[in-house]
Amino acid sequence: TAKTFNERMQKLESHIYELAGEKFNIASPKQVGDILFGKMQIMEKPKKTKTGQYVTSEEVLQSLRSKAPIIDDILAYRGLKKLLGTYVEALPKLINPKTGRIHTSFNQAVTATGRLSSSDPNLQNIPVRDDDGKEIRKCFVAEPGCLFFSADYSQIELRIMAHLSGDENMI
């Protein structure tokens, strides 16, 4: 629930402030960079953007995880914030009052690769890699007597086109 996510974020926030020795906006890449690279100096020559700000992307922070415990907490905080805003709080608002379901739109001619995409909301991107993502995925439940089917076929659109066209070169 949103309450659980918020409680976990508050604990992480308190711990981050304790490790940093001060309060700052954890959602601000600039302030995170100033704390990690300016104040705590966890790296000798940190990367900077064209505007002179420290780079605090997930990739950079992942590479520095062993340098300071605060980094794991910042990454965890960012992850929870993303899940909270994108799924936990947003998806319930998208439930159709008539059907009690969330409806997506599948787009056939949007991607450069010809693959299907999903939007409003993107239900092809529901997290599953970690425990929090698995909990979010559990919110999607099939009606009694029905089931969800998930398949990820390599180049399925191209394979269907080859089959339907009967083109010997494609088959």
Locations of regions flagged by a protein language model:
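Conserved "right-hand" nucleotidyltransferase catalytic core of DNA-directed polymerases
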Residues: 1-131, 141, 145-147, 154-157, ...
